[in-house]
Amino acid sequence: MAITKYKAAAVTSEPGWFDLEGGVRKTIDFINEAGEAGCKFVAFPEVWIPGYPYWMWKVTYLQSLPMLKRYRENSMAVDSEEMRRIRRAARDNQIFVSLGFSEIDHATLYLSQVLIGPDGAVINHRRKIKPTHVEKLVYGDGSGDTFMSVSETEIGRVGQLNCWENMNPFLKSLNVSAGEQVHVAAWPVYPGKERQVHPDPATNYADPASDLVTPEYAIETGTWTLAPFQRLSVEGLKINTPEGVEPETDPSVYNGHARIYRPDGSLVVKPEKDFDGLLFVDIDLNECHLTKVLADFAGHYMRPDLIRLLVDTRRKKLITEADPNGSIATYSTRQRLGLDKPLSKKEGDETTDVL
């Protein structure tokens, strides 16, 4: 049965920098906290595990190499025991989880998100379609079968996007067309506009993301929009500074940017600069009607006979194989990574749950 009213939470906290195990433990702690608070849904920031590598915007190539090595070593495979522990935490708390993480698949990293159900199943697994600017130093592109965002669940049609994907008009159109009701606008960590230096545009600072892009997404799509953000501490600044470079000393410009918005774009909650934890919201899916009765860009307020979006969800592989019938064999990333398999009952248990 669909649940139309429930409590949800957005995480605004400091990740376990370069620390896969620490990040997993902190993730489970927040899932437990959200579950104890009565939440049906909790949303984490972009690449929460093992933290967003903001240092890549400030380092030279040679400075980046040891940091990249360490970052890759602490990124998480989606079919890993670390991910299964997180999935079990979701199941133990009977809660939906939107998790952003740096995914390692073979030798490439991706800015990935999963939507985990209250049974521990991975409902959706997606990868950011295009890393932003210097993010290409670290991450690869998502493929056709890993970029869809919206999933039908008992708490509504839930969508997820990473960072500047939230201002991509084509991705917004795609999500609107799926009837999205609850959206996770997952953001990383980056400074506020008080740190802006000419000619760097305001686009590249946290305030427009929090106070322009995110509420714009909410009002354009008519969705409850949760915007989890990472934070930084003095120690975090040191960890994210290459050896031999003097670290910044004031982390406050990086903090206080998480938000939650109603479907009409009005603000529900924003944290103080020093707040670290969960932001809560009481969601009523029926409130989406108040906005969508005025403007539903997937229905009465659109003209598909004039404007349409072409979407290609096929995976393009480097190596193709012939199947027994002589045509091209296909497989999905989801199947290859084992996400179609049920979750084991407990850590170390080889048996699986009944489907």
UniProtKB/Swiss-Prot annotation:
Q: Recorded E.C. number(s)?
A: 4.2.1.66
Q: Which UniProt keywords apply?
A: Hydrolase, Lyase
PANTHER family cross-referenced by the UniProt entry? CYANIDE HYDRATASE, NITRILASE
Induction remark = By cyanide.
Q: Name one GO biological process term.
A: cyanide catabolic process
In this protein, the active site sits at 46, 128, 163
Lineage runs: Eukaryota, Fungi, Dikarya, Ascomycota, Pezizomycotina
Name of the molecule in the record: Cyanide hydratase
- The CN hydrolase domain, residue ranges: 6-286
